[in-house]
From Swiss-Prot:
One of its GO terms (biological process) is proteolysis involved in protein catabolic process. GO terms for molecular function: metal ion binding; threonine-type endopeptidase activity. A double ring-shaped homohexamer of HslV is capped on each side by a ring-shaped HslU homohexamer. The assembly of the HslU/HslV complex is dependent on binding of ATP. It holds the Pfam family Proteasome. The lineage of its organism: Bacteria, Pseudomonadati, Pseudomonadota, Gammaproteobacteria, Enterobacterales. Its EC number is 3.4.25.2. Its main location: cytoplasm. This is ATP-dependent protease subunit HslV. It is found in: Cytoplasm.
């Protein structure tokens, strides 16, 4: 499992995640890159779940982004439709957190595409810890999105045994 967190504040969206890969109760790798830029670096995405499954979904999602000229909501919906309707794809176990300069979404294997009302996304085993920390920091500090993501991931990593302190953090800016 893992922790992926996305925070959108002012004119910036940031997605960060840890790098731990586990097999059962064993840490197999501590520096997996679970955050990627896609579609000419106009979309950032992170995954929670099986690594091989997530990379398969990243490839499919990148093809959908190209097919729909980078329209994030449309590409996400089309990926979710395929994921839900294809027998082989339904067996993939992963969640995607994706964002462009305007929109943040969660894509699930159940065919759900969810846009959080507060532009805060947290997925994975440490997601609820990171989300709680991020909400508290957003409401009670003047930290920027990068700082909130890093501090929240640190809090999650201190609590969740499936989350480590090896973070990858990426950001996008909007004209807003």
């Amino acid at each position: 499992m893992t922790t992926i967190l996305s925070v959108r504040l002012k004119n910036k969206v940031v997605i960060g995640g840890d790098g731990q890969a586990t097999l059962g109760n064993t840490i197999m790798k501590s520096n997996v890159k679970k955050i990627r830029t896609l579609y000419h670096e106009k979309v950032i995405a992170g995954f929670a779940g099986g690594t091989a499954d997530a990379f398969t979904l990243f490839e499919m999602f990148e093809k959908k982004l190209a097919m729909y000229q980078g329209q994030l909501p449309r590409a996400a919906i089309e990926l979710a439709k395929d994921w839900r309707s294809d027998r082989m794809l339904r067996k993939l176990e992963a969640l995607l957190a994706v964002a462009d300069k305007d929109t943040s979404l969660i894509i699930t294997g159940n065919g759900d595409v969810i846009q959080p009302e507060d532009d805060l996304i947290a997925i994975g085993s440490g997601g609820s810890y990171a989300q709680s920390a991020a909400r508290a920091l957003i409401n009670n500090t003047t930290l920027n999105a990068d700082e909130i993501v890093e501090k929240s991931l640190n809090i999650a990593a201190n609590i969740c045994i499936y989350t480590n302190h090896s973070f990858t953090i990426k950001e996008l800016f909007s004209e807003k």
